[in-house]
Amino acid sequence: MALILFVEYHSAFRQAASYLMDQEPDLKVVAQGGSVAEGRQRMAEGGVDAAIVDIPLPDDGAEEMVRDLHEANPSIPVLVMTHIEDRGVHERFLEAGAAEVLPKEVSFREVLAAVRRLGH
C-alpha cells in the first residue's frame, strides 16, 4: 500500500480527493497539508511513500520544498499537480526533483494512475 502525503491549498478538494484515494485498496493518504510549511512539517514526520504537491501554494517556496523533499528522501517520488500551463514551470519542478508534473484538468483516474506509477 502506498502511503501518501497530499499538499493542496484548497481544503475541500484535498479532503475529497484524499477520501477517494482512501477508497482504493492500494492507496492511503496518511498526511495532508495546505501550505509549504505544513507540507514540510508532514514530510519531516515521515511515514510516507509518495507525495502529491499542488502548485502554486499560498506561502510560496513550493519549488524549494520539492527540491528539499527529493534531496532528503530521493526514494520518495513527488507528483506535482498544477493549473499552470507554462512548460518552463513544469521543467523547473522536474529539475527540482519532481517525478512527474500533471495538469489539474486530468481525470481522477489519471491522478490515480500517476500515483500508482510513482508509488509502486
Please report, for each region that a protein language model flagged, where it lies by residue:
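Acidic, metal-coordinating helix/loop segments flanking the phosphotransfer/catalytic sites
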Residues: 32-50
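Alpha4 helix (beta4-alpha4-beta5 surface) of REC/receiver domains from two-component response regulators
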Residues: 64, 85-100
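Negatively charged, flexible loop motifs adjacent to catalytic sites
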Residues: 12, 35, 84-88
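Conserved acidic segment of CheY-like receiver
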Residues: 2-12, 17-21, 51
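Conserved phosphotransfer cores of two-component systems
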Residues: 44-46, 69-75, 96
